[in-house]
Amino acid sequence: MNKISPEAEKVRNALLSKGIETPMITPEQDRDTRRAGIEQHMREVMKLIGLDLRDDSLEETPVRLAKMFVDEIFSGLDYANFPKITNIENRMKVSEMVLVNDVTLTSTCEHHFVTIDGMVSVAYYPKKWVIGLSKINRIVAFFAQRPQVQERLTEQILLAFQTILETDDVAVYVKATHFCVKCRGIKDTNSYTVTSAFGGVFLDDRETRKEFLTLINK
């Protein structure tokens, strides 16, 4: 396993302490070994559902799935992939709300391994630190790139920013479509799920919370 950054370690410990870390283990194998193992098992799965892997459209699918699982859609299970974060001292004494709206969210439902597709809004009131705006998108993407439930994902994003920015004054709002509802089971193509998490002034002050919700829904 690759070494993880101090920021990643702080965030992971915070999630573990609060009991909202994703249920996961640390694999003993390196990435190549894991990809090979997944490929082998996916070949068996595809055969069991009745697919002919001799077809040129299917023969490389197990390889593609293994690479996708390890290197892409579940890469957030490895804290070595946590975004590089450099806190910037708040020398300008920014005291107004910083809001990043409509951050693209693509995750995977941990119950059925199908897509969760939506948008995230993140806001905070700076104290000692600010961070680059793109880092907000990257942190959201990191926690999305793992099997998830939306409620836990929302809380993880909140606590990650509270930990990195060293402030409780953070708000997170997630609106997403779950393809486990859309393409199977009830097959509801219209519904979406909204979750939110508030800390500090967003939790304690109704007007601040109202301002945030008004801004993100304009």
Curated annotation (Swiss-Prot):
Q: What is its EC number?
A: 3.5.4.16
Q: Where is the signal peptide?
A: none
Kindly list any coiled-coil regions of this protein: none
- Read off the InterPro entries from this record: GTP-CH-I_C/QueF (IPR043133), GTP-CH-I_N (IPR043134), GTP_CycHdrlase_I (IPR001474), GTP_CycHdrlase_I_CS (IPR018234), GTP_CycHdrlase_I_dom (IPR020602)
Q: Which residues bind Zn(2+)?
A: C109, H112, C180
Record pathway? Cofactor biosynthesis; 7,8-dihydroneopterin triphosphate biosynthesis; 7,8-dihydroneopterin triphosphate from GTP: step 1/1
Q: Does the keyword Hydrolase apply?
A: yes
Listed under GO cellular component are: cytoplasm
| Keyword entries, A-Z | GTP-binding, Hydrolase, Metal-binding, Nucleotide-binding, One-carbon metabolism, Zinc
Gene Ontology biological process terms from the UniProt entry: one-carbon metabolic process; tetrahydrobiopterin biosynthetic process; tetrahydrofolate biosynthetic process
The record's annotation in PROSITE patterns points to: GTP_CYCLOHYDROL_1_1, GTP_CYCLOHYDROL_1_2
Give the first-level EC class, as a single word: hydrolase
UniProt GO molecular function: GTP binding; GTP cyclohydrolase I activity; zinc ion binding
Superkingdom, natural source: Bacteria
Spell out the Pfam families in the cross-references: GTP_cyclohydroI
The reactions it catalyses are:
GTP + H2O = 7,8-dihydroneopterin 3'-triphosphate + formate + H(+)
What PANTHER family is this protein classified in?
GTP CYCLOHYDROLASE 1, GTP CYCLOHYDROLASE I
Q: Which family does it belong to?
A: Belongs to the GTP cyclohydrolase I family.
What HAMAP family does this protein map onto?
Answer: FolE (MF_00223)
Quaternary state and partners of this protein?
Toroid-shaped homodecamer, composed of two pentamers of five dimers.
Q: What is this protein called?
A: GTP cyclohydrolase 1
Source species, please? Pasteurella multocida (strain Pm70)
